[in-house]
Amino acid sequence: MQVLPPSSTGGPSRLFIMRPVATTLLMVAILLAGIIGYRALPVSALPEVDYPTIQVVTLYPGASPDVMTSAVTAPLERQFGQMSGLKQMSSQSSGGASVITLQFQLTLPLDVAEQEVQAAINAATNLLPSDLPNPPVYSKVNPADPPIMTLAVTSTAMPMTQVEDMVETRVAQKISQISGVGLVTLSGGQRPAVRVKLNAQAIAALGLTSETVRTAITGANVNSAKGSLDGPSRAVTLSANDQMQSAEEYRQLIIAYQNGAPIRLGDVATVEQGAENSWLGAWANKEQAIVMNVQRQPGANIISTADSIRQMLPQLTESLPKSVKVTVLSDRTTNIRASVDDTQFELMMAIALVVMIIYLFLRNIPATIIPGVAVPLSLIGTFAVMVFLDFSINNLTLMALTIATGFVVDDAIVVIENISRYIEKGEKPLAAALKGAGEIGFTIISLTFSLIAVLIPLLFMGDIVGRLFREFAITLAVAILISAVVSLTLTPMMCARMLSQESLRKQNRFSRASEKMFDRIIAAYGRGLAKVLNHPWLTLSVALSTLLLSVLLWVFIPKGFFPVQDNGIIQGTLQAPQSSSFANMAQRQRQVADVILQDPAVQSLTSFVGVDGTNPSLNSARLQINLKPLDERDDRVQKVIARLQTAVDKVPGVDLFLQPTQDLTIDTQVSRTQYQFTLQATSLDALSTWVPQLMEKLQQLPQLSDVSSDWQDKGLVAYVNVDRDSASRLGISMADVDNALYNAFGQRLISTIYTQANQYRVVLEHNTENTPGLAALDTIRLTSSDGGVVPLSSIAKIEQRFAPLSINHLDQFPVTTISFNVPDNYSLGDAVQAIMDTEKTLNLPVDITTQFQGSTLAFQSALGSTVWLIVAAVVAMYIVLGILYESFIHPITILSTLPTAGVGALLALLIAGSELDVIAIIGIILLIGIVKKNAIMMIDFALAAEREQGMSPREAIYQACLLRFRPILMTTLAALLGALPLMLSTGVGAELRRPLGIGMVGGLIVSQVLTLFTTPVIYLLFDRLALWTKSRFARHEEEA
């Protein structure tokens, strides 16, 4: 046992050096807490940053977009607009459907938003149409968020109506009950119903009208309370055969008598079991199917939700007939898991590379083991804190830990290198550990808190980008803090027990060769540094030129928002001429599906035609293209999209818009392309004037591609122009006309069949097979006040007009959305600037407002705050360094290293062809924290040499640079190798990680080369400035 004199120091490390058992057990506790925390952490693609979003859907079959807007959407919007915490309200009113999406502030709990929405719907109930089949239905889901899982249900033996009924009652309800599921939608529209197709000629010949038939059916099928009898000894409940359950029963229904003979419904109509809406259809690949899309609630854990669904599926499918097949077509968690696995592999690779570089420099196994223990201990211990903060294992937190690998080893290296230096001088290991740890303690604290200071501004970033990177910043900060603790406790304790003069002097051939190599490098550096110190102004001009170059590169580098990921799923919109019918669109969709399924990268395809909560019009179709796993296809998603669009261009009469699904979804509506730009006006007429003009100009811009608009005002309308005087004379009201038209052509839901498991509708319509098109209007008959039958054509003229296929609102005002993509040779920043320049040339009137939406709006917000974010990081670090050094000047010397990092990062991004996006910006901010450590280590030792050894500033900084060259080089290479796996990543999610790695590797290389020479020069210049300032003050005091 080594006996130390009472004067031996050690600073905060002394207690831990002297108590190895307690220190070891403390570290074991940290390790166990981290392991337990890791097992408890959920897995997700990104941190949960969803806006609280609620979608309200109201279906009113047969209603035109104009009727849906005025009668359904507008009353609801007026009530929703009064809710507190509402960030944005958008709506889409199309034929028979109103979809309102409510996006709330990030700080508002989703449950509170749900209560407000329910209260608003209740308040608007009396303002909605009295014949609305169902009240508005809300769901806690973002419609723009792609489904976490898509399932297709098919059968070769059963009709789709039966399949849909079983899926709805046996499968969908159970999945909806799983925690985290926000909405389960069934696409395909094959819900069972009894369809009554009236023969217009038959009822006209009998002097009947469709209203007569409707009244007879609704009166014959009821399900209401009948009471009970309560006698002296027993009670009897009353029941009756008041319901009709099958199509056969409806055929036998007597609707009227003529000459004493009954007229049954089957005499004047075709009554059959069919689908509630015959203008809806879905396909899985080429087979008609019921497609089940499962969307998560905002904030729900996607992995655990998907796992729960998969665990329940076998049990659910067992309840279905054997002829029914359930297929999982897509599962987003597959790619999420693959991405997280790849990131974890890169983390392990970074740890291995860092340990390797430590051994290369220390050339000693015991000395390598010490940081080899410190690195995983610091990283694993971080998991325990992540659990308490409700974080998850996701790409960003794992990226933070990967980058932290290079950071956390720095502290251990600095401590080991300093203690080893004293052991090599002949001191006992315990004494060397106490002396070296005590001497280096302030440096460790400076490195730690100045690095954490850089991360502080990230915590104050607003909106969704700030939420996104909060987990990243805190995870990295926690790892750095734990590393500092380990370096001041475990590392010096292990050095005192594991290092010795013999172990450090023991050399093999590799050790001797590498030692000579390092000696030659240090000698060459010393000669170069001496020359540089003799030309300070030239060196200063180089430093200033890097600052100017970094500003120029910042201005001219292409800028983006968030890397476009390859998640293996493509969302598509198929657009046909505005007058296309359901049958025509279904045929076009099948043609396109045939082309898409021939592509070698495509694994499966689901498609949907019809109007519902996601598809606004009959002339459009929704597609979801599921690609093969990344390792089973040759091309990334962007190349696949380009190939598919080229192939589909050969299909006449359709336009295909494709975009890859992303883990980060900011939009609130399903769009055709990745980016959106809106025009908002006080009237539809203003939009009809200016949208075509702007579209024409935008489509000519090379910075944009796939430019399209949701403005469709050429939908065919048969306008029934009623002569009100003639109608009034015959006792026919406008309500009679609307009812007659609705009965004939609205797929009107006139009655409900109640069963124990579900409810089914009775649908009334005219059989138009023999009278297609506008000729069907000639068959409409109305009843006059004297009981006669009057043809509609006798009181009305039919005019063919055009009208919008859908009417969109943003915050209650008409709006149109222009969607666009960005070509490969341009950036989002280029596109945004081109749109803004084009808008200025149009001189839009004051009642037209424009705004970017979704990720484009977030890009503008992030770009505007980026400069201030970097300034805040620099200021925060200056304040921390100024406090630690009790100096106004030394922090400036340290911060002078920053421009070199910026130049290196921006040059690397340019060379790699990467955009300056939010991921790359985070890398630059981290570089601010990394590169200043070189200056800190130099200045700490220079100040100590001046103070304790009486050296001149020049000699002190020169010796400090030579003395700290090896740990500086070692820590820089460790940080570089920690970022290298991210830069070289090629697996799933590599697009997200690569910009961070590229920027950091480039910044570290350039800064390492330059700061070794510029920092000493700037240190001496500021020293001279301080002396000159002191002399001036002294002179003024003497004169005073």
From Swiss-Prot:
Keyword Transport carried by entry: yes
Protein family membership: Belongs to the resistance-nodulation-cell division (RND) (TC 2.A.6) family. MdtB subfamily.
Domain of life assignment: Bacteria
Pfam families referenced in this protein's UniProt entry, alphabetically: ACR_tran
Statement: the UniProt record of this protein carries the keyword Cell inner membrane: yes
Function: The MdtABC tripartite complex confers resistance against novobiocin and deoxycholate. MdtABC requires TolC for its function.
Gene from which this protein is expressed: mdtB
SUPFAM superfamilies: Multidrug efflux transporter AcrB pore domain, PN1, PN2, PC1 and PC2 subdomains, Multidrug efflux transporter AcrB TolC docking domain, DN and DC subdomains, Multidrug efflux transporter AcrB transmembrane domain
Keywords: Cell inner membrane, Cell membrane, Membrane, Transmembrane, Transmembrane helix, Transport
InterPro entries: AcrB_DN_DC_subdom, Acrflvin-R, Multidrug-R_MdtB
Induction: The mdtABC operon is transcriptionally activated by BaeR.
Membrane topology: Multi-pass membrane protein
Example of a GO biological process term: xenobiotic detoxification by transmembrane export across the cell outer membrane
Subcellular location: Cell inner membrane
Transmembrane stretches, start-end: 15-37, 345-362, 367-389, 396-418, 438-460, 472-494, 535-557, 867-889, 909-931, 968-990, 1000-1022
Subunit structure: Part of a tripartite efflux system composed of MdtA, MdtB and MdtC. MdtB forms a heteromultimer with MdtC.
Gene Ontology annotations for the cellular component aspect, listed alphabetically: efflux pump complex; periplasmic side of plasma membrane; plasma membrane
Protein name: Multidrug resistance protein MdtB
GO molecular function: bile acid transmembrane transporter activity; xenobiotic transmembrane transporter activity
